[in-house]
Amino acid sequence: MSDLQANKDAAAVNRQSSSSSADLNGPSPMRKMISVASIAAGIQFGWALQLSLLTPYVQLLGVPHKWSSFIWLCGPVSGLLVQPSVGYFSDRCKSRFGRRRPFIAMGALLVAVAVVLIGYAADFGHSMGDKVDEPVKMRAVVIFALGFWILDVANNTLQGPCRAFLGDLAAGDAKKTRTANAFFSFFMAVGNVLGYAAGSYTNLYKIFPFTMTKACDIYCANLKSCFFLSITLLLVVTIIALWYVEDKQWSPKADSDNEKTPFFGEIFGAFKVMKRPMWMLLIVTALNWIAWFPFLLYDTDWMGREVYGGDSKGDDKMKKLYNQGIHVGGLGLMLNSIVLGFMSLGIEGISRKMGGAKRLWGAVNIILAVCLAMTVLVTKKAEEHRRIAGPMALPTDGIRAGALTLFALLGIPLAITFSIPFALASIISSSSGAGQGLSLGVLNMTIVIPQMVVSFGVGPIDALFGGGNLPGFVVGAIAAAISSVVAFSVLP
């Protein structure tokens, strides 16, 4: 009886895949895969702005540091629900425009809506009654949170179908799948560099002088200007890719089972019939993101608060110190992205020389653990310097160089995190006959659930130990070390 049920579950998982890679006449040319992968540059431009500017911005709107992580919780929640849903429905989409292209187009339009809400949150809040001098601008915070939620929904609506589209175009070719995902990671790096460069340029608002208003200061105006550039890039690369790359209309095979399986039945069916290699991949991915998310959430805040000794809630001098640290953190993230880009292009060759993906992934997780642990040393050196030179003293060149070096080195494991898990999931799903969209949606669940855990836990943990960022980073270092051991020992 259990074997019969397992077979039914397997049929449910595989039913939507009747045209995943088999209906393409072999792999598509690499230039088409690169065109689709380039959408990642537009996605990541906006994501880079989220990571580098929005945590400080929401604190300027009046949200305390320990609660800002709860606003970020909307990202993991939307990822948990949206990406598997989009994967499921895109696997089954019968639109004449193809399976993936309608979802990619819808995601790009949602990004445009979100950018307007986020960029103009302070202005909308002021027009609804927020006072410029009040510490907590509640209406602006609500509008910001709504825009932030929509932006995360849009990013998940875009990213899942893009990666699934690459899997479709690779048509089961393992090497092309790895290469396509490496290019996706490379274009993420390109988007990061552009986003962090824009975020670190303090006079960008002068290009769009209308962005500065009574309710929106220079920092806010720069944020608006950055998002205008972001949505322009995203729309350009998306339009080019959707026009250039054909996405064949899907229709079920004549001999396929036409019974419709509910979405949640399909998800649970996927977990029931999942083979050991996929389970091991999910475990390592989950540990990896427990390690990453505290740093991705608070990296620039760490530069402004711990390294530079500033405070977003302090007097003008402390705010100035904090903003200086934020902008240097933006430079660090740009260096991180440059390393990420070069590493992405070399993943295939390095993986072969090291003897496979599990050795490479395990090795770079050691780098991740060491770098996260070293943030403690950099912070202590900065605090010691301020005790000697005075609380308003800028960090020494050595301290600043040490912090920027950590940012740069973290680009190495980040390239692997953005590439190898998705390539392995695509390869495993192709070999098992599962739909690309659903398989990548299941993988995404092991990314966003750890993010939810971190979002709930890191703020209170940081507050318990004095309100800084180091406790979350130390938890990340421990998780990275564990993920390295697991990658070496259990990945196939």
UniProtKB/Swiss-Prot annotation:
Name of this chain's protein: Putative sucrose transport protein SUC6
Topology versus the membrane: Multi-pass membrane protein
Bilayer-crossing regions: 34-54, 69-89, 102-122, 140-160, 182-202, 225-245, 278-298, 325-345, 360-380, 404-424, 447-467, 470-490
GO MF annotations, alphabetized: sucrose transmembrane transporter activity; symporter activity
Superkingdom to which the source organism belongs: Eukaryota
NCBIfam families (UniProt xref): GPH_sucrose
Region (Disordered) location: 1-26
Role description: May be responsible for the transport of glucosides into the cell, with the concomitant uptake of protons (symport system). Does not seem to transport sucrose.
Pathway as given in its UniProt record: Glycan biosynthesis; sucrose metabolism
Organism name: Arabidopsis thaliana (Mouse-ear cress)
GO annotation, biological process: sucrose metabolic process
GO (cellular component) term, any one: plasma membrane
Composition-biased stretches (Polar residues): 14-23
Extracellular side: 55-68, 123-139, 203-224, 299-324, 381-403, 468-469
Keyword Cytoplasm belongs to the record: no
InterPro entries, per database record: MFS_trans_sf, Suc_symporter_pln
Keywords: Cell membrane, Membrane, Phosphoprotein, Sugar transport, Symport, Transmembrane, Transmembrane helix, Transport
Gene this protein is translated from: SUC6
Side Cytoplasmic, residues: 1-33, 90-101, 161-181, 246-277, 346-359, 425-446, 491-492
Pfam family, one: MFS_2
Compartment(s) of residence: Cell membrane
PTM-bearing positions, type Phosphoserine: 17
Protein family membership: Belongs to the glycoside-pentoside-hexuronide (GPH) cation symporter transporter (TC 2.A.2.4) family.
